[in-house]
């Protein structure tokens, strides 16, 4: 299509058209005319579009290539791994916020850790220099100050006691650091003491600029949802979990509709799956409502081994649960894992949506992320 200086359509009509087009096709309009190109770079439009498509989640898989999988449409796309990750042996942690992915990467040569923010859709990467060093046992949060949507911040919780097991239990107070993209610097939060810990296998979730994790008290058994508000830079307990979680059980947290949480629980004994959802997180009191309770011989085992990816899932716009599943192959000498995406309906019907191939458990020579849910966006990587 020939390019033009200006479109014959009014800008509000162009915006309305763009808001109905999937993000994968939007960038094609960059070549149409300068007016359309400018719209796709306009901050107001970028966030308006993102909010409209919050329910258009995808799974991202990084093996020898980057795969974006849309389980609702049964579609997938692929692209090369960014050159910035050439010396990365492994991406061990991801946190998603507004289409941006915070990645903790292990350096292939030095075996040390680095931190990057990456927009897979725009193929942009920014490395974040540490205040001191990054640890294998850091926990991270990613959000923004609600005063301004694009003022992004990172949270780092460094627990030296976990890093070095020879330390005397309880002798080290976890260090809290905040990185502000606006000032391009880290700072330590001095007056925060933590008497709780984040559940290590579970992925944290960023919702409307705040961070949420499954956590537990250090000196008693209760499990709860812990949040961090990036505007006030404070921690807050949101609510307790609506069930008891045993050692063999699996629990996974996800965002829902852009303003609430959902929580998946699979019993390690019966394999029954239940999903709970909250009311709006902005409400004064946040509580759980059971969304679905499924008992079926067709249910997959979501977390069969500690070496496999912790479950990732989301609830689509048709109220189906899309779950990333990994199953070890039955061959004794085979180190591969079969990867698929399953759909669980509210009626308990289980259906495999996509066979995503295999992954090698023993491979340690490439970045690898298997099944992380995120929303593609036009949000630029903060400078």
From Swiss-Prot:
This is Putative F-box protein At3g22650. Residues 3-50 form the F-box domain. It comes from Arabidopsis thaliana. It comes from the Eukaryota. Pfam families: F-box, FBA_1. InterPro entries: F-box-assoc_dom_typ1, F-box-assoc_interact_dom, F-box-like_dom_sf, F-box_dom, Gal_Oxase/kelch_b-propeller, SCF_F-box_component.
